[in-house]
Amino acid sequence: MAAKEVKFGDSGRKKMLAGVNVLADAVKATLGPKGRNVIIEKSFGAPLITKDGVSVAKEIELKDRFENMGAQLVKDVASRANDDAGDGTTTATVLAQAIVNEGLKAVAAGMNPMDLKRGIDKATIAIVAELKKLSKPCTDTKAIAQVGTISANSDHSIGDIIAEAMEKVTKDGVITVEEGSGLENELSVVEGMQFDRGYLSPYFINKPDTMVAELDSPLLLLVDKKISNIREMLPVLEAVAKAGRPLLIVAEDVEGEALATLVVNNMRGIVKVAAVKAPGFGDRRKAMLQDIAVLTGGTVISEEVGLSLETTTLEHLGNAKRVILNKENTTIIDGAGVKTDIDSRISQIRQQIGDTSSDYDKEKLQERLAKLSGGVAVIKVGAGSEVEMKEKKARVEDALHATRAAVEEGVVPGGGVALVRSLQAIEGLKGDNADQDVGIALLRRAVEAPLRQIVANSGDEPSVVVDKVKQGSGNFGYNAASGEYGDMIEMGILDPAKVTRSALQAASSIASLMITTEAMIADVPEDKPAGGGMPDMGGMGGMGGMM
């Protein structure tokens, strides 16, 4: 086991504070509409230029191990805020730095760290409750566009395209961000339910010019097993042929004789048919088949529920207005499912999203929810170079997270004003003793830090602006982009309440733990021997007689 170095008390805390300040100073330069860029060296390719706080934080590793511990803890603050609300990483970092700096001064002055922590916790709970009171619902497209614009560093084109995407696919829809090929941002929306499985045979194609198979007003046969024997399908195929409607088969697989017979029937025009593999694997496949069944008003043919292909009738089949299959995807448009059944399925999936702790499962459930409720929108980011593309894509993703958070918990005045206004919640707040009162006062000063930093980055005097904002009330604040004072909501400067809340909670949680640190343990760096020289060759002297 490697030897350890231990630092106690003030000497350890000073090192930790130095690390906190290095990381926070790099990150906070990006805050606000006039935040600066940070350039990050990459091991290959061009350096990365970014104004994204979490991208800056992720890159920082310090040589001194004790300083690095402080930096990594603040990095954790940024990650927590990002995981919870998808944005607010820079605000969380600025708050954490302010709380740690103020807190460690109080500890050095002889205050009890545990009481300071209790005071900070008490004040945080009161401010979070006040933020919830200050928040206004965010439902209209204009407000959503404003939130997206602010989060994307005042880029109106990003805010507008996100608002348009949300309007088209609803708040439950999936919006994905991809790299585009042009200079402008583009939005494409997939209507209906799409899943990533294409036709099983190119012989199903009936539109050779676009290489797709299109079925108008089809019936859907949903089967939870492999189909290889055509005989078991004959009754249902005959019934479909009599009905004179096309048929889409969605099964675990269709192979061998069954696939060949379907192709022949399709080419001869006996039954217009197409077959596709069911999306997903294992239990997820069963769930997605059930989703398609609910959406189209059909029944999944599964031995688990006592149904077999031989006994399948037209009543078991789903209905849709149209189905389009290409090589990679299948889209079901306007399924004939009962609305109450679809709503019930949606609420069931929402419940599962709330219950699961796995990010992967959550993402897959969110996709299923979107396919049932809204649809899928793809934002293609346009840029003039690869470096600009990476930077812009990160901003679009941030803005997308921020708008989702705004729809979820509402919006508050932006530009650090909401935190300053929420101070009224702790005006008369008292702790159980004098040290807890210091903890409350400490947080009162710290929550001004984001506003101060936004003003500093815009080149103005922080103290003057903070005093003027404090003298105002309601939504009155400072627009750093234009240098004007006024109503932040009317000026379109909004922050999602969830982002502000998550930033404060993450910052006060980690910062108060750092204040109560008494010992720090790190590995002692090993002295590696200088390489390059050959080992001692002294034993070669006896070779002289070989001449």
Curated annotation (Swiss-Prot):
Domain of life: Bacteria
Pfam family membership, one: Cpn60_TCP1
SUPFAM superfamilies: GroEL apical domain-like, GroEL equatorial domain-like, GroEL-intermediate domain like
CDD domains: GroEL (cd03344)
A single cellular component GO annotation: cytoplasm
E.C. number: 5.6.1.7
Binding positions (ATP): 30-33, 51, 87-91, 415, 479-481, 495
UniProt subcellular location: Cytoplasm
Top-tier EC class: isomerase
Annotated GO biological process: protein refolding
Keywords: ATP-binding, Chaperone, Cytoplasm, Isomerase, Nucleotide-binding
Catalytic activity entry: ATP + H2O + a folded polypeptide = ADP + phosphate + an unfolded polypeptide
InterPro entries: Chaperonin_Cpn60_CS, Cpn60/GroEL, Cpn60/GroEL/TCP-1, GroEL-like_apical_dom_sf, GROEL-like_equatorial_sf, TCP-1-like_intermed_sf
Gene Ontology terms, MF aspect: ATP binding; ATP-dependent protein folding chaperone; isomerase activity; unfolded protein binding
Known role: Together with its co-chaperonin GroES, plays an essential role in assisting protein folding. The GroEL-GroES system forms a nano-cage that allows encapsulation of the non-native substrate proteins and provides a physical environment optimized to promote and accelerate protein folding.
Family listed: Belongs to the chaperonin (HSP60) family.
Subunit organization: Forms a cylinder of 14 subunits composed of two heptameric rings stacked back-to-back. Interacts with the co-chaperonin GroES.
PANTHER family: 60 KDA HEAT SHOCK PROTEIN, MITOCHONDRIAL
Name assigned to this protein: Chaperonin GroEL
Protein's gene: groEL
